[in-house]
């Protein structure tokens, strides 16, 4: 029996959305449940790749948190080359260089206001606590949170 194939998500930022708007994204590993990220050999490399893209203005990362089999991030993207291309290239680099296997595609949600931004920030930081991986958010080591978290201007 063939399983249904999920539709491919477009990840195109509409023209009416301001460039530099924040997006909540989730990227999952394949297979689910396998700890590919929260280990010294890959966790630091994934966070370093996130930081590299931030520092080179490929994207603007407000927060990235690694979980054993997925990551959550709040990122702003330039209109060109666009979210889909940027994330695809980043996943390809991390997979090729560090052996992380990703699921096809990723989830994104545009954060429409400051309330949503703060809500998703709290959700991300509390994720390892909810999963009983640590007692307090500040105890979780697999986080990239740059000092410059202001919205970008490309």
What are these regions, as identified by a protein language model?
Residues 1-154:
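Short catalytic/metal-binding and nucleic-acid-binding patches
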